[in-house]
Amino acid sequence: MILRFANLTAILALCLAAKPVDPPLPDPDAAAAEFGPAIGEPQLALYFTEPTLQAALGELQAGRPANALRRLPRKPVDSPVKWLRAMALRADEQPRPARALFEELALEGGPLADRALHLAALCAVDQGNGAAAERLFAQVSLRYVEADQVLLERARQTMQRLEAGPRTAARVEDILQPIFAGQVRADVAAAHLIAGDAQLAAGAREKARAHWRSGWVEHPLSAAADSAREREGQLGPGSSISSSLLLRRAEILLDAHRNRDALEQLSHIRVPSLCNGGCPGDRSASGYLKAALLALGALPQQHQPTPQEVEATPAEPADPLACRVRLDQGRALRKEREYGRARAALAQVVLRCSEAETRSRALFVLAQIETVSNKPTAGPLWEALARKYPESPLADDALYYEAIAARRASDPEKERALLDDLVDHHPDSDLRADALFRLFWAQWTDGRPRQGLRWLDQLAAGPESDGYEEERARYWRARVLLEPQAGETDAARASARETARTDLIWLVEGRPLTYYGLLAHGRLVELDPDRARAVELARDRLLQSPPPPALHAGTLARDPHLLAAIELLRLGLKNEAAKEISAIDRSPARSAGEAGYEPLTLVAELYSRAGDLRNAHAVVRIELRSLLRKPGSALARRAAALAYPLAFREQIEHVSETAAIPPDLLQAVLREESALDPRALSPTGALGLTQLMPATARMVARKLKLNGFSAGRLLDPEVNIRLGGTYLGELYARFQHPALALASYNAGPGAVSGWLKARGTLPLDAFVEEIPLDETRGYVKRCLRSFAAYQFLYSNGHTPALGQTLAAR
């Protein structure tokens, strides 16, 4: 019997060996070991699933903690319910039992232990128990996301608890030292404000002044800066503040686009005039500009400057600090579009200053102003910068924009020579790809597109981070090959069309969420409609496949802020979770290559669940650009949905119907204008989701008879979307094309009408490449890309059909 069973076992083994077997299912434990734990719906679900607990959470979030407490057990056993009850007790102004529960939670440990200690300490403060508060505050780790608030409150409580004097002031400074030393990310000015108060209470007026001065001079962007300045003013006159510190303050304000504040600060810095002994008799803006050109040897091309003229520097250079002050004034005035005053300031720097970095930057901004103003002086200024400072990091910019100026001056030979120089001698330039494309474009516009293919091939082969240049190169290579070639044989023509078809299919199938993928789809529909339909069917099937059920944390698995964020989300504390997510150290995932895609997508997913759509889409847009361009995988599609969320969709659909525009087009404008931030403010003063200028908004508000309108109402999403959508609808009705409506939204309808008058016979793709403003050209491409992405993701893989024909208006 045993023998017969053994024979049967052997036969079964042979049969099983002969039959193909399914691959083994992945071992979850092995996957977790390699990729980190999988975090999906079960790991992120709200703790409070019972109706009573859900109702308690709702009451607490609605500001009715007493109602929440009536629905909660008096002695909870589970930690989540303890958290809910402790928060309700504190909100109901019952600090003693709340503190007891928070201390109990802190003893349990876990990712929220520091938060429990912090809240327990605040309860002790509410009780008036300073000693207990100090004991609890002292236990909170500096890694805690709100460690700055712990230190600031601990310092305040120390001042209240101890008698004023030098020892107390020193103790306050010791507590705040991690903030002063940069160990904790914090509002440093707020810390100086408290330390100054402690020193003043101790009778040390000058020590107090030093703290308050540091607060407003070194940290002018802080909300505490004005208070610190006011406190110092109350002490009366003190020692003078060095001009270099005030200049640094002005530059911080300028970099933050607080241009008027920067100009006000610069006007109070005492420096000698740059005109002493060196400025020309004609002190007008045009006089300064003419003198600057002469000083640099930047004369018209027929006069080749001698080396002595090019190398000319001021015989008696002006004070370097005064030069920086005037440079910054010129920069601020340029940003405020006060071009006449900016020219006067910058030309003085070019004429009278010798420090290479200051002088070259002044020349750069001066040339920018002339370029924006479409002045013929732009080209000579760019030439002067490139010749005078060939080793400057601005030299490649100068070559590129001098080439653009040459093109505007109808000098294609000079344009090509300058672009060749940039490509050959500045291999690491961030403008090299644009130079290669402009070299191709020069051939295209001259009617010799095939001769430009070599530049496109270089562009497609060049290393880049996100694939944009390869997309641009392959689209235009297809366009070139689809153009008839004189004397071309039928075989050569068929070969060219097949190569073009291959490039178009590559874009349509592999890069549907891109601008050039959108254009390629329209071309493929014309060239091979059957293949285009097949691609759309494949997209439909792709989008119907389920997303990944969970995301692996990978190298971020042990980050304490990630773990804390997950717990807070499960407790329903979205705002607190968003702070923890922002504190996650993403560098391990960034440096992991493609292995970091999933953890970074998880970060974006957590932001989305916390209600922070702006940061959710920013993570994908900035950190996952390569993944986003190729939505063929389930992970990429999940990332794409986070990058293109349907934020404010109800308002958008309502306004779009009234304005007669596609809702996805308005959704795209919101995404590109404000990154979905209702409180967005641009350097030029545009406000809110659709980034309307107040003057434009007032005009639209009058048409809509919106009574009581003020610029502040643009921060209301509903008002902003209504006004921005209505304005976009007016432009859409006027120009009858999404691309033209977008261009006019950015640059103004007058500019677009002028471009149409000059180049309205061009097809859409060429017209966009010919938009003379870099900002507007990029804006149109980005908005159309977003328009295509929203259509692709939420319309079963379909993309908008953009007509290539434009009618001049």
Task: Label each PLM-derived region with a short phrase.
Residues 2, 17-666, 670-672, 676-683, ...:
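Acidic, polar-rich low-complexity tracts and alpha-helical solenoid repeat scaffolds
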Residues 686, 713-715, 742:
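A glycine-rich, coil/turn loop motif that links secondary-structure elements
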Residues 6-15:
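Bacterial N-terminal signal peptides
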Residues 709-719:
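A short, structured beta-strand-centered segment in the mid-to-C-terminal lobe
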Residues 491, 495-498, 507-508, 605, ...:
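Catalytic and substrate-binding regions of cell-wall glycan-acting enzymes that process beta-1,4-linked
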